[in-house]
């Protein structure tokens, strides 16, 4: 999908785990089917997941992103009642894979694209509670920007207005 995409497989993840985390050697590794294009996710045994960045250009940037995501997950875990993936190890580049990667707690459940939660009142309440919890986290001077992820809300006004107008029959 991406020009700089790094190929990954369950065999590669097994080799990385065996070399870097011998305590998890022998655990079964299987790819998690996901629509994501930024990370590949592999189930490791019953309690872990390996997340491998798929964009191969910048190992230092990948490490910063993984460390930042782990810090954000810790902060999020304290702000809501909902479980979040907890990073338990940070892997290093290895033979066949040029980037740092993460091992985190496996969270059981299903992704939102597996079911249509549109008519679920409990889901809507949970989502509202989660968003309120996230909004209550103090930004502490941090700036959030990025294409489609954060930034100045007024820059997204036209797109959101279009989405809301086209969703009138659903809302």
Q: What residues fall within each predicted segment?
A:
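ATP-binding pocket architecture of kinase catalytic cores
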Residues: 2-3, 26-170
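Juxta-kinase regulatory segment immediately upstream of eukaryotic protein kinase catalytic domains
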Residues: 1-23
């Amino acid at each position: 999908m991406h020009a700089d995409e790094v190929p990954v497989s369950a065999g590669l993840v097994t080799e990385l785990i065996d070399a870097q985390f011998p305590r998890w050697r022998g655990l079964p590794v299987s790819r998690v089917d996901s629509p994501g294009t930024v990370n590949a996710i592999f189930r490791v045994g019953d309690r872990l997941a390996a997340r491998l960045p798929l964009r191969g250009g910048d190992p230092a940037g990948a490490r910063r992103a993984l460390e930042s995501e782990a810090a954000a997950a810790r902060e999020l875990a304290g702000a809501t009642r909902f479980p979040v993936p907890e990073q338990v190890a940070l892997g290093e580049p290895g033979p066949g894979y040029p980037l740092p990667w993460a091992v985190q707690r496996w969270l059981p459940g299903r992704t939102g694209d597996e079911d249509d939660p549109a008519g679920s009142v409990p889901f809507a309440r949970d989502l509202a509670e989660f968003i309120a919890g996230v909004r209550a986290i103090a930004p502490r001077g941090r700036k959030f920007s990025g294409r489609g992820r954060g930034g100045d809300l007024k820059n997204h006004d036209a797109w959101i207005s279009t989405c809301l107008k086209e969703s009138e029959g659903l809302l």
